[in-house]
Structures are given as structure tokens and as C-alpha cells.
Regions:
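Catalytic-core regions of core metabolic enzymes
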Residues: 1-354, 358
């Protein structure tokens, strides 16, 4: 990765100033940045309004005090190129382009997206047609909707091609620790591999969760995936566009070609990538890795609150070739002291949540 590109990704994810260009959508994004806890400068840009979200508006990008580290762009597609040229003039760092109307709409949009990429020069861009980025470690957000998520100082970096999926994951109530949420959209400039390469050395990032509709550059992805494995930071992939209808929707959604699922499965397996089928599976798998670390073998212990649950765990565990080790005799007495008399000490272990019957 070119040094200037790396530097501008860093500016985008760790900004001291954010320019919000647009109207109502920019106002929502400003409020979300404030709610996230962003402590830097907030600069709204709108030629028709005096204030947005309580902040005085600049009439033009050229009126800004300096080149902002990060920019949230929510204006009509027809105005994007001119605005990006102005951002180049003031030496901005990185852009989140929330605006749609590019590759995903067909040939006219493809042409406009090519112009957009050419106009960036050394700046970096997430999108277009994306939600943006959230840095939970540094409390910065360029995000156009209400969001959730928490960070205990470590967690997973989620990188998706779907805006709504990324938003849904931030709202999960499954205690998944997050470091970053990145919604890529059309990936005109920055790809998922750029963010993997940037985040791979961050000690707080323990795993990567990727939602993938397609992979544009196989060799770049392979290199990034191998780096992640070498760094012992597993990649968990949710691949969509598996069905014929899903592949068609993928093309209309972000302009991507889904490709053969069998080829993707073989490719992921070769790279040691974990694949899942649902967002819930992704969340639970990442949570396990971030909290417990990478499993060293197939031996495990399971605890449930019902006999039916214990049976299901045992059945599924056997299907997955997991080994439920016998509890050593020396430990049975200690475990028994924590459980009611009716409990059966086994693995899976049934933890009764109600007390023993009383006289």
C-alpha cells in the first residue's frame, strides 16, 4: 500500500476534523458523530443553510479552515465530481460517499464512478452508495443512521458491502465487541483488503468479519487473508449472492458479479477462512474468537439450562466432530458444590436454573 494511501486511511478512521457536506442526511450524521463521542472539529458545508445541528455552516469546501481529515458526502451524484475536486484542492484525507447513483444503476453510473475514482488522486474514498465508517476505539463516526455497538478496548472489525446489514450488526444485542464497522458499498476506491491491511497490526483488532458479495481482485484478497492468518486474526466470511436470484440482486445492489459459490467455498477453505451462513452465526463466531481466542483443538465443555438444550448441544457437537471430554473424578465434587442435588454432573453439563423442591 502506498504510504500516502495508508496515511489517508488513517486520517479517515482517526480524524481530528470531519466535514459534513449536504443537508438532512449530513445533519443526522453530525448527530451520530456527537452521540458516538467524537471530540474533534465538526464542519458542516451547505450553501443554503446558516446552521446544521447547531454548527455554523461553511458555504463552500474552499471556505474551510483547512483540509479536513475526513468528509461525509451526502449530495446529489451530479455534484460529486466538482466537490471532490475542491476537496483535493484543500488537501482533504478521506471521504465517505453516502450518495448513490453510480455503478449500481448501470452504464451511466459506471462512467460517473470512473470519473469519481480518477478525481480522487491521493485521497481515499469509501463507497459510493455506502453507509460509512465507525471507529469504536477512538469514538469517531461518519454514519447516516442511528447506530449501536460497544467496545471494551478490543473486538472485531466488521467490513461489509451492505449498508443495512452493517447497521443491523451495530444494533445487535449479543455482546459482540467491536473495534470498527466499515460499510464499503461499491468499493470504487477502498476495498475490504485495504482495511484488512491497515488494521492487521492493530493489537485491539482480534478478528475480521466480512460480508462479501464478490471479490474483485483475488490475488490481493489472498495476500491480505494470509497476513491475517499469520497474525492469528481469523477472518469470518458471510458470502451472499449464492442463489440465482441472490446473484441477480447482488448485481443490482452494488453492481457486483457474485460468481460461483463452489469456487468461493474452495477458495475460502484453502485460505483457512471461516464461512458462515447467517449474520447471527457471524456474530456468535466472532464473539467466541474475540473473547476466548482461537480454539486449539476439538475438546470442549458445554453448559446448558435444560435437558433438551444439553441433548441438542451433544447432537450438534457430534455432527461437528467435537469431543465432549469426561469430567475428571477429582473435579466432580467441586462442581457439585455449585449445583443443586438434582443436577447431573456430565459434559454437556445441565445447569438447573431453579432450586431443588422444598418441603
Amino acid at each position: 500500500m502506498k504510504e500516502i494511501r495508508y496515511k489517508n486511511i488513517d486520517r479517515l478512521l482517526n480524524p481530528s476534523q470531519i466535514a459534513f457536506i449536504g443537508g438532512a442526511d449530513a445533519e443526522v450524521a453530525i448527530n451520530e458523530a456527537k452521540r458516538r463521542g467524537f471530540k474533534g472539529s465538526i464542519w458542516p458545508v451547505n450553501p443554503k443553510r446558516d446552521y446544521i445541528a447547531g454548527y455554523k455552516c461553511y458555504k463552500s469546501v474552499l471556505d474551510l479552515p483547512k483540509g479536513p481529515d475526513a468528509v461525509f458526502l451526502a449530495i446529489p451524484a451530479s455534484q460529486i465530481i466538482r466537490t471532490v475536486n475542491e476537496l483535493n484542492h484543500v488537501n482533504a484525507g478521506g471521504i465517505v460517499c453516502y450518495s448513490a447513483g453510480f455503478k449500481e444503476i448501470g452504464q451511466r453510473g459506471i462512467s460517473l464512478e470512473k470519473q469519481l475514482v480518477k478525481s480522487l488522486k491521493d485521497m481515499v474514498l469509501v463507497g459510493p452508495n455506502c453507509y460509512g465508517v465507525i471507529n469504536y476505539l477512538e469514538n469517531s463516526a461518519l454514519w447516516p443512521f442511528a447506530h449501536g455497538g460497544f467496545c471494551p478496548g478490543f473486538g472485531a472489525a466488521i467490513i461489509t458491502q451492505s449498508g443495512m446489514l452493517s447497521s443491523d450488526i451495530t444494533m445487535n444485542q449479543r455482546s459482540l465487541p467491536l473495534t470498527h464497522m466499515i460499510s464499503l458499498g461499491n468499493q470504487a476506491s477502498l476495498k475490504n483488503t485495504d482495511f484488512i491491511n491497515y488494521l492487521i497490526d492493530k493489537k485491539e483488532v482480534r478478528a475480521f468479519g466480512l460480508h462479501i458479495e464478490s471479490i474483485e481482485n483475488i490475488s490481493d484478497f489472498e495476500v491480505a487473508a494470509k497476513k491475517a492468518i499469520e497474525a492469528q486474526k481469523p477472518i469470518v466470511v458471510l458470502k451472499t449472492g449464492k442463489s440465482k436470484i441472490g446473484a441477480t440482486l447482488t448485481k443490482s445492489h452494488t453492481g457486483s458479479i457474485a460468481g460461483s459459490q463452489k469456487i468461493y467455498n474452495s477458495f475460502f477453505k484453502k485460505l483457512g477462512i471461516i464461512t458462515v451462513d447467517t449474520p447471527s452465526e457471524m456474530i456468535e463466531t466472532l464473539k467466541f474468537i474475540c473473547i476466548s481466542g482461537i480454539p486449539k483443538g476439538k475438546e470442549c465443555a458445554a453448559f446448558t439450562c435444560s435437558g433438551g438444550g444439553a441433548t441438542m448441544v451433544a447432537d450438534i457437537g457430534e455432527m461437528l466432530n467435537l469431543k465432549f471430554s469426561k469430567i475428571p473424578k477429582k473435579n466432580i465434587k467441586a462442581i457439585s458444590s455449585f449445583l443443586p442435588n438434582i443436577a447431573t454432573i456430565s459434559n454437556p453439563c445441565l445447569l438447573y436454573t431453579s432450586p431443588s423442591p422444598r418441603d
